[in-house]
């Protein structure tokens, strides 16, 4: 678990449109890296290339490489489905299968992989719900629909579903943007616990959240409309927020633009 990601000369295209240019950074294991920047700068686009989710969009392609412990996830013969098992994704809005039970939501990925043993599935469901700090709240209603949970509980259910297949990396695309402050705090506390076992990359528009949860922060920016987004600066979060090297970074985190 908790593998290193290295992005090298990453360029992302949608058809002829050059969306993101020349990104290079290292994401260290057992740490949280935050992607910040104004809307349209490419941070979510970069996030989705880290497990090849962008490929669901027609015309999407990448140049450069994304290495997971030295292996290029875009290399010949690499199955995108196996990549997404190793590098899990938690989306902006909670997306449990609404009519599926809480238990079945958690183990849906395992069932797709052919796991059918009930004891194994029950053990994984319990372990994953405990890992997502949700077990105590739902252990007496595992057969009820996941869609009946609160928004914050649904997001933790989605995190439980993601970790049930034992990924090495967790990607989170604004996981708290649709949640209230109390639920947001619960997710942030969970992220701090999860980084002991996983490599985590989070996209957030909340500067305070980035400062609270991340060890490293990468700031992306857009030069102009129609131009590709670029990585401006990446460093330890404390340094990014206290003494950034680029003026654009300072202007963004201080609220002068964005």
Swiss-Prot record:
EC number assigned by the record: 7.3.2.1
Residues bound to ATP: 37-44
Main location: membrane
Subcellular localization, as worded in the UniProt entry: Cell membrane
Reactions this protein catalyses: phosphate(out) + ATP + H2O = ADP + 2 phosphate(in) + H(+)
Membrane topology, from the record: Peripheral membrane protein
GO biological process: phosphate ion transmembrane transport
Any one Gene Ontology molecular-function term assigned to this protein's record: ATPase-coupled phosphate ion transmembrane transporter activity
GO cellular component, one term: plasma membrane
Annotated ranges, domain ABC transporter: 5-247
Highest taxon of source: Bacteria
Keyword field: ATP-binding, Cell membrane, Membrane, Nucleotide-binding, Phosphate transport, Translocase, Transport
InterPro entries linked: AAA+_ATPase, ABC_transporter-like_ATP-bd, ABC_transporter-like_CS, P-loop_NTPase, PstB-like
Broad class of enzyme this protein falls into: translocase
Similarity comment: Belongs to the ABC transporter superfamily. Phosphate importer (TC 3.A.1.7) family.
Protein task: Part of the ABC transporter complex PstSACB involved in phosphate import. Responsible for energy coupling to the transport system.
PANTHER family linked: ABC TRANSPORTER I FAMILY MEMBER 17
Assembly description: The complex is composed of two ATP-binding proteins (PstB), two transmembrane proteins (PstC and PstA) and a solute-binding protein (PstS).
NCBIfam families: 3a0107s01c2
Protein name per the record: Phosphate import ATP-binding protein PstB
Record organism: Mycobacterium sp. (strain MCS)
Organism lineage: Bacteria, Bacillati, Actinomycetota, Actinomycetes, Mycobacteriales
């Amino acid at each position: 678990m908790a593998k290193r990601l290295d992005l090298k000369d990453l360029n992302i295209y949608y058809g002829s449109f050059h969306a993101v240019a020349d990104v290079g950074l290292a994401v260290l294991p057992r740490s949280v890296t935050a992607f910040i920047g104004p809307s349209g700068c490419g941070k979510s686009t970069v996030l989705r290339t880290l497990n090849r989710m962008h490929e669901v969009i027609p015309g999407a392609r990448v140049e450069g490489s994304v290495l997971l412990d030295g292996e290029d996830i875009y290399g010949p013969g690499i199955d995108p489905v196996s990549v997404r098992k190793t590098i899990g994704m938690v989306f902006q809005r909670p997306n449990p299968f609404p009519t599926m039970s809480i238990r079945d939501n958690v183990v849906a990925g395992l069932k797709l992989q052919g796991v059918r043993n009930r004891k194994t599935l029950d053990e994984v469901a319990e372990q994953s719900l405990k890992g997502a700090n949700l077990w105590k709240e739902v252990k007496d209603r595992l057969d009820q629909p996941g869609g009946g949970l609160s928004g914050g509980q649904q997001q933790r259910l989605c995190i439980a579903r993601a970790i049930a297949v034992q990924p090495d990396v967790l990607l989170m695309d604004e996981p708290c943007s649709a949640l209230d402050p109390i639920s947001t705090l619960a997710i942030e506390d969970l992220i701090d616990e999860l980084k002991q076992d996983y490599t985590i990359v989070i996209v957030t528009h909340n500067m305070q959240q980035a400062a609270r949860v991340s060890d490293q922060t990468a700031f992306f920016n857009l030069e102009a409309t129609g131009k590709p987004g670029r990585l401006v600066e990446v460093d330890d979060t404390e340094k990014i927020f206290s003494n950034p090297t680029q003026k654009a970074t300072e202007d963004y985190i201080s609220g002068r633009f964005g």
